[in-house]
């Protein structure tokens, strides 16, 4: 499929791999709903009020079965939605087909080119009947970046004149093409946006940087730093989905291997737990002395990547940073070392430096990089998200936590957006606790209650919030 020939005025207002997969997708959506109690209960609570009536949400987030349940929750609360995936490999094609069949335009399929990816990112802002999106639901910040960078390019084309990587080549070309058709395409759409809710660490970093520089054009909710997102999705989700991706891709026996996890934040903690749980010897690399000490106190060996490169069997990047595994590291690795990334973008591994060598595709999202001496390194998902590129991402239950936060943030921004300045906000503690409460019964948890005397003794309301905002869970 070639994005260059996709007609945005076509009567077919979607692009998916195969609409015939919709029946399969619907069956999996029905199963997922039973594991997503937060979203289901939010539907029940707010459906009569229709708090998102009039919201036109441009969504850029992995088009998975779990995301399908989120989309249908937003629609049940009154929103109109258009959707694209935030990663070229993460779409589950049957999920995309099922959501399209139910009436939501989706522009996503597994294995998009970068040109197609950025074309689809534009399509979520192309509403029929002269309407415009007024909300963004983002994961990684690409949809937000697109409107802001495009608006800047309307006034100064030099900002898209010098791409530094293949991603920027495709992005800048896509912006240039749209500006040739309509020189105010981006600013017209940017003017209608009430705010954005951002799902992941990388996108949140972008938002805080824009706020710091005075460039944030609308209010933003940092969903990632809700406790019921970062301490659950990032940790417990990765604890299950990392090894799922590695094993589906390679069938490798993890027990007995040396596995290196780069980064010991919430994502890295979950990855390290899962690898150790399957019998690997786990080493951690870190730049932060606090995180390094945490890793050491958990029994992990803290080393540098330079030390580990020629000794380990499996490498996982989880930092959100740039070239954490570089060309020299890969050149030093053992034959058939497995290299993968679970951070949002593909910049953590210097994949571009290996394009000079022969690549041998084993199967979708699994490649051998063949070095001049004959050594092979196994690269998963071309350095993009291994858990979504090589498997199906996090389990439904933990994603219900994250997506319940997203839904509440969308309601808050859409209904009370005028009360917020152009800054980055987090959901209040009482909503974080609400999200957790909605999920307890599904796993048989029973919550104790404070007596009046107990509440008075520790100085909190009987119904919460129970912790101060600065409390670290």
UniProtKB/Swiss-Prot annotation:
Binds 1 NAD(+) per subunit. GO terms for molecular function: adenosylhomocysteinase activity. SMART domains: AdoHcyase (SM00996), AdoHcyase_NAD (SM00997). It holds the Pfam family AdoHcyase_NAD. Its EC number is 3.13.2.1. NAD(+) binds at residues 200-202, 234, 263-268, 286, 321, 342-344, 387. GO terms for biological process: L-homocysteine biosynthetic process; one-carbon metabolic process; S-adenosylmethionine cycle. CDD domains: SAHH. May play a key role in the regulation of the intracellular concentration of adenosylhomocysteine. Belongs to the adenosylhomocysteinase family. This is Adenosylhomocysteinase. It comes from Burkholderia thailandensis (strain ATCC 700388 / DSM 13276 / CCUG 48851 / CIP 106301 / E264).
